[in-house]
């Protein structure tokens, strides 16, 4: 039987580990939007520094960033969101390209109308540079100028004709364009305005919008085309600065090693 108390306390195995700040191993990269938008500097993103075989720039490729069109074009009120995907890294700049577009949930809820017919259509179209897009459009019927009746419902046969006309307009607007031109049309929503004008011959429409656009098939990344989209935003990072020296300059001889 042990008598007394053992004052020799044994330390715990391994001891207490020192807390390491996880942000000390990370670095910031600038997110650059294509030149279709007014604001080129979208924001910043974090990634772990290059360690061994884990290269930081490779980990950034494929990241998707969602940005409001209001922030991209410096407008106060806009209800569309663009998704940009990182395709290349130049120095500390992440070069992005268009990935998808959608409307905000609040806007979709605000345009739904009672006593009107909701008409939706979607189709897959291919651009000239090899992208396959699925485009969704939404529209509502509208009262005629001299209409007395409270409701503005239309027949199913006419809905089919309107839907067919919508798909024809989308194919006409997208098929002959590359991705850059398509995005340039999505920013002011000129496709939705053309659909409203064309389909109003069949039945008066209102609140016609391109509701969503997503890429369902993309070609192999063309870095030359991507760099053309970013142009002036590409800067090559260097550790030092260029120094002008005369043609007969000779470096000094090092005396000691």
From Swiss-Prot:
One of its GO terms (biological process) is translation. Residues 237-257 are annotated as: Disordered. Component of the small ribosomal subunit. Mature ribosomes consist of a small (40S) and a large (60S) subunit. The 40S subunit contains about 33 different proteins and 1 molecule of RNA (18S). The 60S subunit contains about 49 different proteins and 3 molecules of RNA (28S, 5.8S and 5S). Keywords: Cytoplasm, Ribonucleoprotein, Ribosomal protein. GO terms for cellular component: cytosol; cytosolic small ribosomal subunit. PROSITE patterns: RIBOSOMAL_S3AE. InterPro entries: Ribosomal_eS1, Ribosomal_eS1_CS, Ribosomal_eS1_euk. Belongs to the eukaryotic ribosomal protein eS1 family. Pfam families: Ribosomal_S3Ae. It is found in: Cytoplasm. GO terms for molecular function: structural constituent of ribosome. Residues 239-248 have a biased composition (Basic and acidic residues). The lineage of its organism: Eukaryota, Metazoa, Ecdysozoa, Nematoda, Chromadorea. This is Small ribosomal subunit protein eS1.
């Amino acid at each position: 039987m042990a008598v007394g108390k053992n004052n020799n306390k044994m330390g715990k195995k391994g001891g207490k580990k020192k807390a390491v700040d996880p942000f000390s191993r990370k670095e910031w990269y600038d997110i650059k939007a294509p030149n279709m938008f007014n604001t080129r500097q979208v924001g910043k993103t974090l990634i772990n520094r290059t360690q061994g075989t884990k290269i930081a720039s490779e980990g950034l490729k494929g990241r998707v960033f969602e940005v409001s069109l209001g922030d991209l074009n410096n407008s106060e009120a806009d209800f569309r969101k663009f998704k940009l995907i990182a395709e290349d890294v130049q120095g500390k700049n992440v070069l992005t390209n268009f990935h998808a577009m959608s409307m905000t949930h609040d806007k979709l809820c605000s345009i739904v109308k009672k006593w009107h017919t909701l008409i939706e259509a979607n189709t897959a179209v291919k651009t000239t540079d090899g992208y396959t897009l699925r485009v969704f459009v939404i529209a509502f019927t509208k009262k005629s100028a001299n209409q007395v009746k409270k409701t503005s419902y239309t027949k199913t046969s006419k809905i089919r004709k309107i839907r067919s006309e919508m798909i024809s307009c989308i194919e006409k607007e997208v098929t002959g364009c590359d991705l850059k031109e398509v995005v340039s049309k999505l920013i002011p929503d000129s496709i939705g305005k053309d659909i409203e004008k064309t389909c109003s011959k069949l039945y008066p429409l209102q609140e016609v919008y391109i509701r969503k656009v997503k890429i369902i098939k993309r070609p192999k990344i063309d870095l030359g085309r991507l760099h053309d989209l970013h142009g002036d935003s590409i800067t090559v990072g260097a550790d030092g600065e260029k120094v002008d020296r005369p043609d007969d300059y000779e470096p000094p001889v090092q005396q000691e090693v």
